[in-house]
Amino acid sequence: LITCGLIIFSFLNLTLTGLFTAQGDSRSPLMANFLGLVGNMLLDPLLILGIGPFPRLETAGAAIATVTAQILVFSVLVFRIFTSRLEPNVLRGLHLFSRFPGKFYKNILRIGLPTAIQSMIYCMISMVLTRMVSAFGAAAIAVQRVGGQIESVSWNTADGFASALNAFTAQNFGAKKYDRIRQGYRISFGILTIWGLIITAAFVLLPRPISGLFFHDPESLGISVNYLIIIGFCEAFMAIELMTIGALSGLGMTKLCSIISIILTGARIPLAMLLTHAGMGPVSYTHLRAH
């Protein structure tokens, strides 16, 4: 109730982050989100456990900490609108409540709606898969959650490159500088291929030491080792996939990306059922994580 009641700040933060990145300023969103993360980390134990003068609010405390952090991020981003020295700063002097031509709304919906639908469907599919994983016990659920966080070393990096390439591609596409688009894609492709191969080597060759940082019981450790080995072989492909989606989105081709992603992501559910009945257990879900 608390989080959903003030979810508008989450929406505003995503919008402002996209606008800052589109005009070539990725430092401001980084600084704002870092401060929000630190604020959330500090407030969580204070409000959940009731340390010092703070009341013990438990779950409500976690929600309040999250919302407060989101408001902090929003405040920092608004502050940067007026203090950033980046030129041109398209956000400064923006009249939010002005009337705009109808074609602007049409173009925004044409580009943004497919991605929004894709994200919603992805969340629903993830919930179904999580329900399927829960049938294998607490260890499988723990590995699913922690394994995703370990893998974020790869996909968060790729996602950052995708955001940058999105803005870079859109700017040069508008300026009709197509050679720069190709050059930017090739450079990003090379960097992320190398990074993906490094992560692949780490996951495939060192799965037990990495898993041992998070798990100690034999069951969870065994599942985690299998998880890292299987997803390890796809890290370079996943990085290139996310980067390519960013480039195509910069060209306005979000519908194509969404259709492909929805079809292949949706295929995880019947494949998970098939592999589970084949006796692969929780490892079946891991195979589906391999992009």
Predicted regions span which residues?
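Short alpha-helical transmembrane segments in multi-pass integral membrane proteins
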Residues: 1-6, 54-113, 169-234, 276-289
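Transmembrane helical elements of multi-pass membrane transporters/channels
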Residues: 2, 36, 69-73, 77, ...
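Transmembrane alpha-helical segments of multi-pass small-molecule transport proteins
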Residues: 2, 6-11, 33-41
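Alpha-helical transmembrane segments of multi-pass membrane transport proteins
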Residues: 9, 36, 118-122, 158, ...
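Small-residue-rich hydrophobic transmembrane alpha-helices
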Residues: 10-29, 130, 141-201, 205-207, ...
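Alpha-helical transmembrane segments of multi-pass membrane transporters
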Residues: 28-57, 71-77, 199-203, 256-284
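Helix-terminus/linker motif at the lipid-water interface of multi-pass membrane proteins
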Residues: 46-57, 120-153, 171, 209-218, ...
